[in-house]
Amino acid sequence: MIAAALFAAVLSFAQSPGEDTFIHPELVGNRGRGEVKIPDIEGYITLKGDFHTHSVFSDGSVWPNMRVEEAWWHGLDILAITEHIEYRPKKKYFNDSVDHNTAYEIALEANKKKDLIIVPGAEVTRKKPFGHMNALFVTDANAADVKDPMQAIENMLAQGAYILWNHPGWPDDLCTMYDIHKDLIKQGKIHGVEIGNDVESYPVAYDWITEYGLHPFANSDIHGYIEAVFASRRPMTLVFAKERSLEGVKEALFAGRTLSLTADNLAGRVEYMAPLVKECLKFEVYKDKDTYCVYKITNDSDIRFVIEVGDTMHLVEAEPGQTVKVEIAKGQQVTFRNCILGKGKYYSINQSEL
């Protein structure tokens, strides 16, 4: 009798008010936001962003509202849809009301149901040596639609744009710093560079952060459905902002407060790497001996850290949310092999500083 009553209750719950339709509640989707735990650092909020994506309004294959949904699902705080100015293969399917601002406007409307920071932007697209440049925080992307790419950049800069040099190793797998880039950097007209793009990283470009003063980024450059491209967490740029707002993000980018995150590899300047590692990893002395200490290391982030103790190539993996024990000799160097400061250079501190 009880079983029959329970079955009737479940059946009643699963049915719509009518008799001819049956709803299966186990099939009803309600995907939540997958938070990415990366702590704030002293004085700043840590925001997670993707500053290079595409939709159907250039050569992407999804509507801009899906880019907003994906970014929210994946725990991002910031999203820029940066359509190619010069390459719009689907243009014939749209009417004359569509321009270079349309994707941003649709994303902004879709974001009313979310709480992302939507950055207006566009991608100025040329072959090397010029390459591809994103203009971020633009007020009218149509002003970039001119024949001369240098004039396009000037028009964007006149709007207060931040210029990001995209995928310097694409399409020839060579990261070449051409004279045109050196001149633009010297004039303060290129501000950042993608250390990571899609599933690639560019080790040569790691050194450009210190050598040329560029700010590091890692972005998805997604064109298709993002779940079909990345087997794990999408690339993202960490932004250390004074406040969670569009103006806060803009101020942080122009100040250069960024780190790139590709897979579990962080890259950028030591002044932001050091405080982030300090907040992510908690070192607690478990045993204090004459010549060494045993530490309990707790990873309070969603980044997997690889720690090298001394020069013995003894690697300790600190997985997200886990605590590991490790013996460290007093005065020994501790190197974080997933924290990149340059090509072949990693963030390292002495045991006495732990």
Language-model features and meaning:
Residues I2-S12:
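Bacterial N-terminal signal peptides
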Residues Q15-G49, V68, G131-V138, D173-L354:
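Charged catalytic cores and adjacent phosphate/nucleic-acid-binding surfaces used
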Residues E26-G160, N166, C175, G188, ...:
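A metal-dependent hydrolase metal-coordination microenvironment
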